[in-house]
Amino acid sequence: MTASITAKTCEAWFLLEAADMRGLPAPYDVSVTDYGPVKLGLRSVDDLLVWAKSLGVDVTERQHGERIHWNTSGVLHDIPVALFVVTNVEQVAS
C-alpha cells in the first residue's frame, strides 16, 4: 500500500511540475496538448481523465474557449486550449 501511495504522490507532483514548466496559469491547470511533450501518452481528453482518476485526483473542465499565454523562446503565443483544473492533490500526497 505504501508503494502505491508513493507512486501516486510522485505522479501527482510530476503533473504539477510539468504544468508549472509550461507556464500554465495556476499550478493545477493542465491540458491534453501540454502533456504531449512530456511523454505521458495522453492522446485525448478521455486519456487525461482516466489517468487523473487512476491517481485519485479530481479533474474538471474549465470554461470552454479559455486561452493561455504560451511563451516559447521569447515568443508569446495566445492559443485556445481545453483546460482542466486538477484538485485534491493533497489527498493523493497524504
Language model features with spans:
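Structured alpha/beta or helical-core interaction and ligand-binding surfaces enriched in interleaved
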Residues: 1-94
